[in-house]
A protein has these predicted regions:
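Conserved alpha/beta enzyme-core scaffold
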Residues: 1-498
């Protein structure tokens, strides 16, 4: 079936063209914004056509703005031909990651909730073209988003030209799942009238001026979501420790939950399926497989996010029972899903993943050994600075014990000790609220560090207190010595340690 039946604005029927023709609107040096937040709802046909132009010898270096990470047809295809001069605001693909760390692509790592407003303010440059995936186009030109919303509403508003990919692999049952609202910019912004997870304040479509539309492109390529690893024993242990803490401190009724992207976050949500909790509500960015488990178990009343982000199997599961799941789900622009005002008002329990933590509660979420970018801060900072309970989870050790995730000092700080409330590892929980740094360290060492690293951390902490003292004892000549040792020997353990 063609896309004509999905285009209700008859003037736009004349704009139907091929991906190759549409791609000609993309020129060297342009700022391009696309739909997509994780590998869901991103354009596929036009980006592939752009990459083909470069493969044939044309020079294209572009600034690429999205909601977050996107699929292989965009990030990876463009990175492979080195077409991305600058990337905003998050990424997960192997090739784009290599380009960033090699210096071929400049990467602006920004809190996800702030990007749309900064674009409207003009800080990120003038957007030349927006490429947006649609389920269908309404009579007024409004676009029904598919499996993510991200920054698309603002991109459509700000771009000089718009290319719409109507994706027939996305079911029409997605119509009505989104709630699109663009807030006024400060200082004219009013309070956002959301006091519960399932409240709606906008429209089901993204406004778009039909006069901006230069091409409407058919596409039938499905979302290529990423597999989730099987839930391992470390992740199960973290989930058990956290749920036990919640049961003790919150009782039977929890405030809305926020859960980050990835295997650990999915494992924690999966752990709630086996708990006694009912009537759960989730206000988050991404909706992964465990959310469907909670809905099926009758434990999740409502979930708000900006994107679906399930495994390939989870996505097919969603499509099979789409009417059941969509009744519980609302997708919003990321400046709403990650909004500081709403996170503070709802008193969220925010659960996100750390690369490493230090004995004082600082968290590194982005850079291995302080240097190599992994994915980006994403939305974790939006929630860590505003949630009612801020939780960071990480295994106590990695690489068969060669790396401790609890270190004397993190090599890069994304979330400071001032906002981190709870650290959870497979070893236990450290509740840091109301504590001096010198009170936090013993809790983190004893409750969260791997057993083989506890004596080493105690040795560092005790010597730091004795040698330099102060409010935040730190041995400057040893703070990163564990990382140096790993680079030199392949383990953070000193020679002769078990």
């Amino acid at each position: 079936m063609g896309i004509e039946s999905r285009i209700f604005n008859k003037e736009l029927l004349s704009k139907i063209t091929t991906a190759e023709e549409a791609a000609k609107h993309i020129k060297d040096g342009m700022v391009v914004g696309t739909s997509g937040f994780t590998p869901c709802g991103y354009p596929k046909a036009v980006p592939l056509a752009v990459a083909e132009r470069v493969k044939k010898g044309e020079k294209l270096r572009l600034s690429l703005l999205t909601g977050a990470s996107v699929g292989v047809e965009l990030d990876e295809a463009w990175a492979e031909v080195n077409a991305i001069a600058k990337r905003f605001p998050y990424q997960t693909g192997k090739k784009i990651n290599q380009r960033i760390n090699a210096g071929d692509t400049m990467f602006f790592d920004i809190h996800l909730s702030q990007m749309a407003q900064q674009l409207r303010y003009g800080f990120l440059g003038k957007m030349d073209v927006a490429i947006v995936e649609a389920v269908c186009i309404l009579e007024n030109g409004g676009i029904i988003p598919s499996t993510s919303v991200g920054n698309s509403p603002t991109f459509l508003q700000q771009a000089e030209k718009v290319i719409i990919e109507v994706n027939t692999s996305q079911p029409m049952e997605l119509v009505g799942m989104s709630d699109i609202f663009i807030p006024a910019d400060p200082p004219a912004r009013h309070p956002l009238p959301i006091t519960d997870v399932n409240q709606r304040i906008g429209t089901i479509y993204m406004p778009c001026d039909p006069r901006k539309v230069v091409a409407v492109v058919p596409c039938d390529i499905g979302d290529k979501t990423r597999p989730l690893a099987p839930i391992d024993e470390q992740s199960k242990a973290m989930a058990r420790h956290l749920i036990k803490f919640l049961e003790k401190n919150y009782g039977a009724v929890l405030p809305p939950l926020q859960s980050g992207v990835g295997n650990v976050a999915n494992a924690v949500m999966a752990g709630l399926v086996e708990s006694d909790y009912k009537n759960l509500r989730v206000w988050t960015e991404v909706i992964q497989d465990a959310m469907f488990d909670l809905i099926d178990a009758g434990k999740l009343n409502a979930v708000s996010g900006t994107s679906l982000s399930p495994s390939p199997e989870g996505l097919q599961r969603f499509y099979r029972d789409i009417m059941k799941y969509r009744d519980k789900i609302v997708l919003r622009p990321q400046e709403i899903s990650n909004n500081a005002e709403i996170a503070r008002r709802l008193g969220l329990i925010a659960m996100n993943t750390a690369l490493e933590v230090d004995i004082y509660g600082n968290v590194n979420s982005t850079h291995t050994f302080g240097t190599t970018m992994v994915n980006g801060i994403g939305g974790s900072g939006d929630f860590s600075r505003n949630a009612g309970l801020v939780v960071f989870l990480t295994p106590a050790a990695a690489k068969k014990g060669a790396i401790s995730r609890v270190v004397p000092h993190v090599t890069h700080t994304d979330h400071t000790e001032h906002e981190v409330h709870l650290i959870v590892t497979d070893q236990g929980v450290a509740d840091l609220r109301g504590l001096d740094p010198k009170e936090k360290a013993p809790l983190i060492i004893e409750n969260c560090a791997a057993p083989e690293y506890r004596p080493l951390l105690w040795d560092y902490f005790n010597r730091a207190k004795k040698k330099v003292g102060g409010h935040h004892p730190m041995l400057l000549d040893e703070a990163f010595s564990w990382h140096v040792r790993f680079n030199e020997t392949g383990t953070m353990k000193p020679e002769g340690a078990a």
